[in-house]
């Protein structure tokens, strides 16, 4: 085949890949001011999100108003410290009622609210990354938080060394933004702290003080720099989340859509004679009267837009003092993991036998690729039908395309990787990690270690598998708006890993749906024991605490028909209820979930003649960890997923003693 000669002259000024989201929106017919407003309001995430925002705000009387958004720059804790702070939030709220701190996620303010034109939002987000690169990594010593308690304020103040680092970040961000624009902003450099409580009743002081004193902030914490924006019109409003849908019966009433946020002035509750209040929808920008009982107050930050999040270097592992060379006792095997020689022994031996078969196949057939052995015919994902259709929808300016609905099996699970693992990994009911692929830590649950026997977590590789799928979807340009997960811990963790890889906005939460759990009778011998939504949230999983499941599940036996019907009810209801809101849907469950999705959505067709009866087929054994199935509607058809699959080889446990000669 002849080599392709390089072109020396071209009339094209830029390729399609160089076309910006703004240019695509303009090509779709949207006015420049509206397009910029939509991109700023959705964090410049995608053309699809921006066009969806424009379509939902088509009747918003404020859509053409020249009212720039407000931005704020935070340092936000993540991981165990965030879980600890959220637990404090819950306790203080239930014990003492709402106070000012509950309006926001835990944070340290680096730059206070400032207004900026919509056409600067992308550069404001880029500046966050540039600031981290300019200032460098945070100090390597442990970050310490010092509690402070008074009658009108309670908080945690940052240790001096880390406070100086964050001040440099704040000052550098102000310089970075000011150097390229005339935006007026000011760094917050005095007494950096995390607010725990303020604007609380005097009668709550003692209870709040006790909660602060009981809390011992974890020292090994992770942090992110986050840039948020909000609609300035509602700066002094309270935010309420819709918990029950409502269709207007009068022209002055506001439609309530599950998951929407409503901006309501505090005075509305004082002047209302009948429990109806006036509010404005975050989703549509429309306003009207609504029954307050159909909403629940939530943090203002839930209705903000996250433009950029950049992780700061994890420093906790570098705080240990240096040690000398290995001692004889270390070489003899005194490490905690060395007493678990039998951990995964049987599984490892099975793996080594599979490896022997594989290498025999390679040598006999002279095959040089595992793809040849395990995959059959290769597929060109760049030219797949789904990828082409998706690409055309974007580049051709199609504002309305068929929705994606996905089904994803969970990632690699601990119990099927190691066999009986709990007896090896718990000492006096305390979890000890004895293999690098085991979880770093296990969250507290009511059932203790017995709960983990019945409800296994993911391995570290399982988390990574889930992140790979999310990353693949992100690189394919597909966003997810609605995430439903089986209540099994491995499925909820897979959902979180998927969202991490997708880099989804924190507002995209995991809805734990019992209807997606696999056949109950498979688990009857050892029982079913799920973690509660609160336990999952405390474990750092972004679970929707307000979600009301479509199916309530008990521990009684069920028939196979009842199992399939349970899944059908949940999947069909989720797809139908999210249709008006729009956005793609993913169900994260078990191996059978993929087949179950196909059957459930095919039953939404008008023509039911070709629909096959539910059954557990042989394909169940061909669904590996994090296998992804895809459908598009309407009509509902099985299509190629927008990203390729991933293949993993098994790995046995290594015994270092084989090196002793």
From Swiss-Prot:
The active site is at residues 409-410, 590. This is Ecdysteroid-phosphate phosphatase. It holds the Pfam family SH3_9. Homodimer. It comes from Bombyx mori (Silk moth). Competitively inhibited by 4-nitrophenyl phosphate (para-nitrophenylphosphate, pNPP). Also inhibited by tungstate, vanadate, and phosphate. It is found in: Cytoplasm, Cytosol. The keyword Methyltransferase does not apply. Its EC number is 3.1.3.-, 3.1.3.48. Residues 16-57 form the UBA domain. GO terms for molecular function: ecdysteroid-phosphate phosphatase activity; protein homodimerization activity; protein tyrosine phosphatase activity. Its main location: cytoplasm. Keywords: Cytoplasm, Hydrolase, Protein phosphatase, SH3 domain.
């Amino acid at each position: 085949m002849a080599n392709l000669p390089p072109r020396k002259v071209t009339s094209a000024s830029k390729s399609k890949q160089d076309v910006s989201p703004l240019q695509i929106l303009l090509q779709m017919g949207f006015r420049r001011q509206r397009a910029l407003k939509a991109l700023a309001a959705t964090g410049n995430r995608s053309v699809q999100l921006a066009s969806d925002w424009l379509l939902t705000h088509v009747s918003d009387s404020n859509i053409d108003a020249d009212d720039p958004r407000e931005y704020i720059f935070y340092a936000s804790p993540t991981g165990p410290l965030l879980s600890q702070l959220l637990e404090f939030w819950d306790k203080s709220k239930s014990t003492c009622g709402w106070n000012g701190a509950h309006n926001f996620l835990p944070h340290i303010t680096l730059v206070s609210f400032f207004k900026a034109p919509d056409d600067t939002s992308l550069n404001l987000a880029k500046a966050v990354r540039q600031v981290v690169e300019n200032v460098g990594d945070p100090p390597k010593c442990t970050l310490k938080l010092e509690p402070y308690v008074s009658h009108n304020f309670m908080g945690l103040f940052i240790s001096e060394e880390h406070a100086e680092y964050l001040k440099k970040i704040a000052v550098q961000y102000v310089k970075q933004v000011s150097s390229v624009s005339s935006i007026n902003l000011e760094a917050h450099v005095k007494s950096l702290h995390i607010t725990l409580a303020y604007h609380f009743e005097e009668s709550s002081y003692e209870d709040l003080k006790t909660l602060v004193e009981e809390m011992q902030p974890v020292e090994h914490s992770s942090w992110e720099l986050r840039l948020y924006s909000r609609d300035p019109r509602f700066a002094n409003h309270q935010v309420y989340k819709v918990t029950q849908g409502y269709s207007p019966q009068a022209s002055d009433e506001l439609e309530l859509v599950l998951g929407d946020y409503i901006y309501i002035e505090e005075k509305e509750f004082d002047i209302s004679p009948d429990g109806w209040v006036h509010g404005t929808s975050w989703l549509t920008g429309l306003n009207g009267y609504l029954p307050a009982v159909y909403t629940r107050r939530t943090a203002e930050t839930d209705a903000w837009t996250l433009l950029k999040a950049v992780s700061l270097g994890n420093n906790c592992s570098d705080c240990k003092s240096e040690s000398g060379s290995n001692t004889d006792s270390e070489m003899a095997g005194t490490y905690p993991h060395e007493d678990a020689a039998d951990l995964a022994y049987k599984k490892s031996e099975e793996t080594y036998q599979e490896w022997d078969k594989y290498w025999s196949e390679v040598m006999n057939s002279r095959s040089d690729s595992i793809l040849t052995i395990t995959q059959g015919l290769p597929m060109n994902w760049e030219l797949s039908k789904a990828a082409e259709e998706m690409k055309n929808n974007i580049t051709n300016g199609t504002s309305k395309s068929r929705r994606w609905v996905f089904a994803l099996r969970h990632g690699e699970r601990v119990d099927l990787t190691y066999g009986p693992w709990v007896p090896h990994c718990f000492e006096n009911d305390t979890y000890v990690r004895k293999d690098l692929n085991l979880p770093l830590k296990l969250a507290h649950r009511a059932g203790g270690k017995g709960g983990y026997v019945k409800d296994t977590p993911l391995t570290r590789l399982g988390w990574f598998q889930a992140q790979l799928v999310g990353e693949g979807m992100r690189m394919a340009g597909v966003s997810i708006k609605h995430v439903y997960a089986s209540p099994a811990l491995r499925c909820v963790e897979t959902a979180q890993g998927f969202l991490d890889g997708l880099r989804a906005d924190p507002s995209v939460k995991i809805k734990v749906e019992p209807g997606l759990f696999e056949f109950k009778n498979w688990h009857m011998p050892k029982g079913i024991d799920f973690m509660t939504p609160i336990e999952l949230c405390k474990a750092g999983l972004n679970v929707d605490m307000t979600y009301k499941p479509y199916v309530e599940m008990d521990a009684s036996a069920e028939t196979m028909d009842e199992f399939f019907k349970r899944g059908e009810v949940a999947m069909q209801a989720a797809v139908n209820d999210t249709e008006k809101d729009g956005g793609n849907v993913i169900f994260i469950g078990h191996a059978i979930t993929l087949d179950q999705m196909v059957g459930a959505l095919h039953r939404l067709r008008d023509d039911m003649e070709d629909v096959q009866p539910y059954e557990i087929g042989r394909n169940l054994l061909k669904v590996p960890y994090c296998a992804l199935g895809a459908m598009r509607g309407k009509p509902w058809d099985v299509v190629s997923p927008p990203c390729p699959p991933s293949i993993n080889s098994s790995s046995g446990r290594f015994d270092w003693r084989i090196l002793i000669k």
